[in-house]
Amino acid sequence: MDRSGFGGMSSPVIRDAEVTRTARKHSAHKRVLIQANQEDNFGTATPRSQIIPRTPSSFRQPFVTPSSRSLLRHPDISYILGTEGRSPRHTQSSGYLGNLSMVTNLDDSNWAAAFSSQRLGLYTNTEHHSMTEDVNLSTVMLREDDPGEAASMSMFSDFLHSFLKHSSTTVFDLVEEYENICGSQVNILSKIVSRATPGLQKFSKTASMLWLLQQEMVTWRLLASLYRDRIQSSLEEENMFAIAGINASEKMVVETLFQRDSLVRQSQLVVDWLESIAKDEIGEFSDNIEFYAKSVYWENTLHSLKQRQLLSHMGSTRPLVTELDPDAPIRQKLPLDDLDREDEVRLLKYLFTLIRAGMTEEAQRLCKRCGQAWRAATLEGWKLYHDPNVNGGTELEPVEGNPYRRIWKISCWRMAEDELFNKYERAIYAALSGNLKQLLPVCDTWEDTVWAYFRVMVDSLVEQEIRTSVMTQDDSEELPREYMEANWTLEKVFEELQATDKKRVLEENQEHYHIVQKFLILGDVDGLMDEFSKWLSKSGSSLPGHLLRFMTHLILFLRTLGLQTKEEVSIEVLKTYIQLLISEKHTSLIAFYTCHLPQDLAVAQYALFLEGVTEFEQRHQCLELAKEADLDVATITKTVVENICKKDNGEFSHHDLAPSLDTGTTEEDRLKIDVIDWLVFDPAQRAEALRQGNAIMRKFLALKKHEAAKEVFVKIPQDSIAEIYNQWEEQGMESPLPAEDDNAIREHLCIRAYLEAHETFNEWFKHMNSAPQKPTLLSQATFTEKVAYEHREKKYEMDHNIWKGHLDALTADVKEKMYNVLLFVDGGWMVDVREDAEDDPERTHQMVLLRKLCLPMLCFLLHTILHSTGQYQECLQLADMVSSERHKLYLVFSKEELRKLLQKLRESSLMLLDQGLDPLGYEIQS
């Protein structure tokens, strides 16, 4: 549905500025002053935290004021209701039981001032920015590709900040703050849209965003109103059985009904809510009400009639009414002057719009100001009758309401049925009398239609109660039976709505927020969860981000109230929202939503998020946020490491026997190296860091990626082993370390010994192949060349001696380090000492395989060192070491490797024979 023109939710009246010829004629002389006086009697802005009844059908009044309510009996629960502990229904209104003095004093005061102050009530609790700030913000936003998205990005963090700031006992203050945040953004987006160039696609997106946020704002408003009342009702069960007295007046009967019947009360809250939405929009046309310069109605017709009297001899060009009483056009079936007819239509449209917004008093003021005090009086008859003097008393008190309200209502019903009247005039009196059939034709939007149904439902239920509880003297005339005997339910209203023939209403009925509003009104949480599930399965992550935010916070709100939400759906909503936050890089928000998932899912979800975090500082920040959110940080970091390690499905591969000792480090390897950072932030995780580091290094060693393994080793803090022992001692443990930790420490030392041996061999190998070159002398060398040769030879001998000395030192060092690996203490290299550890078949298999991969190769390298440095006899001693039953190194050699070792030992024996020694290196006895 095209939403490119959203300034807000439309009312049944076209609210563009309509200035008639009469208005234009007088506008040069006098304009309506629109004052911003919030102290005006009728100008008090509507607090966002409460929905105050503004409709003539608002039957709720003094019976629900705080002074007349019983004290709460469960203060521990009622704290949820906020500081006042009262539902919005406890507020006085201008409804059926309202303060008469506010309406009966129909003076000539400028009603427009009140109108303006109502406009100033829009988003009253939002943070007000200075004009300069707004201009600067709007200017910046206009440069964005999607100004609406850019302007509203802060809402994600704002909502979380508000959520964390409030406890479960101030949940309704939290909802009010949600509404205020939305209202603030609506103000900003409205300014952006108003300054935008028409037709640009990016601003149509902004308009759509504006509409979404407006819908969210009013949905939070509805939520607070309904659930505050529902909680209040659960605390005040005694009101369920309230019954009016025998001689109770209409007003008293209705008071009791509202106390007793939650359907009537909450239906009225829906009416109030819908009227508050319309009231927010009322300012769009309030500046253009300039019907008359004086309080004279039908002045053009009056002028024409006077002219005809003066020029009666000239005849009349067209028929006009000849009398100017209110009933004249209908009675005479003659028209007014064209200008007056135009003004009359506009006036009636404005009046209906005011009635739709619950501003009956303002509608009466407008009538009086336009010279139609009689019409203002017709809007007065809905007030419920009450005579406080019936019960006696020393002082005579004024009578309230209309004793002939029933006759007035029947007259309104008949007027609404009369097709001779304008459709908006009929709709006005249809709204006052509960005539749904005549009210619906002017209701073009979802909000207007729902308002019509609920207003009529409340009106009908109240009227039924009055008819059964109040003694009447004259029953000769009754309202239609279908009205008086209607069996209204909330479900029936929405069934009727689904069956409407208005295409726009049907389309709006399928919009996300209207579906949410429907289920909130019905109080059907399970149905709402089912809808959420459908949306996720159909659209998933393509749902608007702000809608996902709303869905998430709505679920959290319902959970706070102790209401059951379907676990599977709630989890999917949270997971989808978390994925949105990840994709939009709201990294600081993710932990606090993840903690609302079940623990195993929370660990998996947050670990998945952390896999994509690569910067060291950001990693540290994410872990700190996880701690604040009470997530299991240790399990999460362990899971991150395991997840990344599992991405490599490569198997352990056997080393070839080439002298090349290292394979290049890939990007995948780099991820595994860096993942260890997750485990070193917290000293309490050093044992886990050791275990995971060992697992990664085992893979690297098997693939001859010694440099990569070395980088992992460096990631582990040097004091890790000492830290593990210290933490164990701090716990007051006198027993040895857990077997898993003990074995991990030993494995870590094994890997360190192996890496040190390889690093030293690399140095030896490099030095061995960088021997100084002996100079040569040409046979026909000159004397000068011979002298130069002698200098080069002396330098060579000096360099060779230095090289030889360094080589001997490196040889001794590398021999020691290699023997440390081959003859590793307490059972051998990569062999666990503690056998009481938890069984880990994969680790055991890898360690056995590493012995078979690394020890034979290291033995061959040691032979190369010894053979290259002329230590042939020691070469032969390798056979004793390999065959030793103490170390059992022969078990890690394959037949091919043993054959190759024997071949190398044979070469060393031949060198000994060339030196005149026996094959084992001993002198030959003569």
UniProtKB/Swiss-Prot annotation:
GO molecular function, one term: structural constituent of nuclear pore
Pfam short name (any one): Nup84_Nup100
InterPro entries listed in its UniProt record: Nup84/Nup107 (IPR007252)
Modified residues (Phosphothreonine): T46, T55, T65
Residues annotated with Phosphoserine modification: S4, S10, S11, S57, S58, S70, S87
PTM sites of type Omega-N-methylarginine: R60, R69
Residue numbers carrying N-acetylmethionine: M1
Keywords, sorted A to Z: Acetylation, Centromere, Chromosome, Kinetochore, Membrane, Methylation, mRNA transport, Nuclear pore complex, Nucleus, Phosphoprotein, Protein transport, Translocation, Transport
Top-rank taxon: Eukaryota
PANTHER family noted in UniProt: NUCLEAR PORE COMPLEX PROTEIN NUP107 (PTHR13003:SF2), NUP107-RELATED (PTHR13003)
Membership in a protein family: Belongs to the nucleoporin Nup84/Nup107 family.
Identification of the protein by name: Nuclear pore complex protein Nup107
